[in-house]
């Protein structure tokens, strides 16, 4: 469904009117910061009082202090500082916030106004240009003529530099969008030229990054939602400029909106795969506020590589695709056939939820950090490290190259079979068979490891065993206990509804793990179904998740 537009810039309930999306995009980011706030007072009030909290770090600068002349507590904090991630918070504070923002921008300009390897890097520049363009009107309303001239020059210079960047191709579309929005707030020929340059780059990348089913090319659901915010902002900015939006822009917005609905699970949060986090319902609602009458959510996203199973009080989403390759894989995870399961509105089964905000914790991108199979002490893929990672980025390599998914729906439920070669380095293929029984409100699963090319008589040769486990990572708000039989596991979520996980594994354990929220680790648990596998023979573990009585 196409985005609905209006010349009226006032705020009303969805669908949004033109002129509202810029503020909604900024407002959603403000909401994200408020969620991260530890002190109970709004972030803008903290900044006005001289305390900056960004990405888990705290810097006390005083009411008139200069954060750009003080060492940041961490690199993550410094990136967020130079991206101006604090700017939406100050814009939300009204006149006082805008005046403080102008002073902080002057502090930044004095030290970093000319090119700098860190501050002008793609990871800082793209969001900084976006924030400056979105906040330009509010800042100009409080600025002097000199401050407005400086702000205009900042947007023009940085916007032009943005379209010239050739690094980080996985963010090329987002850079084109930010540059075009910057052009929309600049008057005259400079603005028109930047718009034309930005739209030209946009046209090159839009259909490469937004897949036919609305998924993002990185396979991260969160990346798709954040891109949707950017495209809505771009659509609004072009309209305010009097420029028509490209058809490809409207099409991408429609597709991303459909995918956002698909990836939103029954607990209201987003599914967390491939470096994306389970963002909050309010953030999702803001992304979809432009059109509240969208199409019925799909049960499959074949281009993105995901399947969803819904029946009774159970909802399952499964990763059924190959990991992205090359630069698109800098946030990808080696977790083929991973599951997230929502039971009666409680997200019980998830993954560790790694995202780039977790900084260097790349071990959580490996197979044993998700609800899937692990073999030995290896992984179905790995991120680059050392010199290659410094040169190229933390690309994911040696991942699954062949992944097949077959689905069958009938009156009684849904069958889903996933087969992949992610464990080919140990000579095994993993097959995960799932059946969601809508009648009995249960999910049955079978995880099999089979030899890729078993030679005749191999089973009679020397016996070599590898540890084999099926892991179910629990949400931090879920708890689990093992029954007296030593096998069955009772899992309960916030609603206190119990679910039995029964299985035929050799051994069962509940082990500690971590779950990341905005890059910060929370304590969580995982249920580990253990067995052993002979690569020449194979092995399987069967399990069933069913609602507990009473």
Show where each model-derived region lies.
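Asp/Glu-centered strand-loop micro-motifs enriched in Gly/Pro and often flanked by an aromatic residue
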Residues: 54-78, 91-93
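Aromatic-lined, polymer-binding surfaces characteristic
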Residues: 74-253
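Short capping micro-motif at the N-terminus of alpha-helices
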Residues: 61, 318-319, 350-352, 491, ...
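Carbohydrate-active enzyme catalytic cores, enriched for enzymes
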Residues: 211-354, 524, 534
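Extreme N-terminal leader/anchor segments
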Residues: 1-62
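CBM-like, beta-strand-rich accessory domains located in the C-terminal region of large
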Residues: 69, 126, 362-550
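Catalytic core of carbohydrate-active enzymes
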Residues: 315-401
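Residues that flank catalytic or metal-binding motifs in active/ligand-binding sites
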Residues: 82, 305, 337, 369, ...
């Amino acid at each position: 469904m196409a985005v609905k537009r209006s010349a009226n810039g006032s705020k009303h309930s969805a669908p949004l009117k033109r002129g509202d999306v810029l503020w909604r995009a900024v407002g959603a980011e403000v909401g994200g910061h408020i969620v991260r706030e530890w002190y109970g007072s709004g972030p803008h009030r903290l900044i006005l009082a001289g305390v900056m909290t960004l990405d888990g770090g705290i810097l006390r600068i005083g009411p008139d202090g200069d954060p750009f002349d003080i060492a940041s507590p961490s690199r993550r904090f410094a990136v967020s500082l130079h991206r101006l991630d604090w700017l939406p918070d100050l814009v939300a504070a009204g006149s006082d916030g805008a005046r403080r923002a102008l002073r902080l921008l002057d502090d930044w300009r004095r030290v970093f106004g000319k090119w700098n390897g860190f501050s002008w890097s793609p990871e800082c520049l793209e969001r900084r240009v976006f924030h400056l363009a979105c906040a330009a009107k509010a800042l100009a309303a409080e600025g002097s003529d000199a401050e407005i001239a400086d702000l205009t020059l900042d947007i023009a210079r940085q916007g032009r530099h943005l379209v010239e960047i050739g690094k980080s191709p996985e963010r090329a579309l987002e850079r084109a969008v930010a540059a075009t929005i910057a052009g929309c707030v600049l008057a005259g020929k400079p603005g028109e030229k930047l718009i034309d340059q930005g739209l030209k780059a946009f046209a090159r990348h839009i259909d490469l990054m937004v897949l036919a089913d609305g998924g993002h090319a990185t396979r991260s659901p969160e990346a798709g939602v954040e891109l949707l915010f950017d495209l809505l902002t771009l659509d609004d900015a072009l309209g305010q400029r009097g420029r028509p939006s490209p058809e490809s822009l409207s099409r991408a917005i429609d597709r991303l909106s459909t995918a956002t609905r698909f990836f939103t699970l029954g607990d209201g949060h987003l599914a967390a795969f491939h470096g994306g986090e389970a963002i909050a319902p309010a953030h999702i609602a803001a992304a979809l506020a432009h059109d509240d009458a969208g199409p019925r959510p799909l049960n499959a996203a074949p281009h993105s590589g995901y399947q969803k199973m819904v029946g009774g009080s159970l909802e399952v989403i499964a990763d059924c695709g190959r990991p992205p390759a090359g630069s698109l894989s800098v946030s990808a995870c080696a977790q083929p056939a991973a599951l997230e399961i929502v039971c009666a509105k409680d997200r019980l089964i998830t993954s560790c939820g790694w995202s780039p905000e977790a900084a260097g914790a790349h071990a959580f991108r490996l197979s044993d950090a998700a609800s899937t199979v692990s073999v030995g002490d290896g992984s179905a893929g790995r991120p680059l490290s050392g010199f290659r990672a410094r040169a190229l980025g933390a690309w994911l390599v040696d991942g699954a190259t062949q992944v097949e998914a077959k689905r069958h729906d009938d009156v009684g439920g849904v069958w889903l079979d996933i087969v992949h070669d992610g464990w080919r380095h140990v000579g095994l293929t993993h097959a995960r068979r799932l059946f969601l029984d809508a009648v009995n409100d249960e999910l049955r699963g079978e995880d099999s490891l089979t030899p890729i090319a078993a030679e005749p008589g191999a089973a009679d040769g020397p016996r070599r065993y590898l540890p084999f486990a099926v892991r179910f990572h629990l949400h931090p708000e879920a708890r689990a206990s093992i029954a007296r039989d030593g096998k069955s596991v009772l899992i309960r979520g916030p609603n206190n509804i119990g679910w039995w996980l029964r299985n035929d594994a050799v051994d069962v354990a509940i082990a500690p793990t971590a779950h990341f929220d905005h890059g910060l680790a929370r304590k969580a648990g995982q249920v580990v179904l253990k067995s052993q596998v002979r690569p020449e023979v194979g092995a399987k573990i069967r399990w069933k998740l069913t609602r507990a009585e009473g």
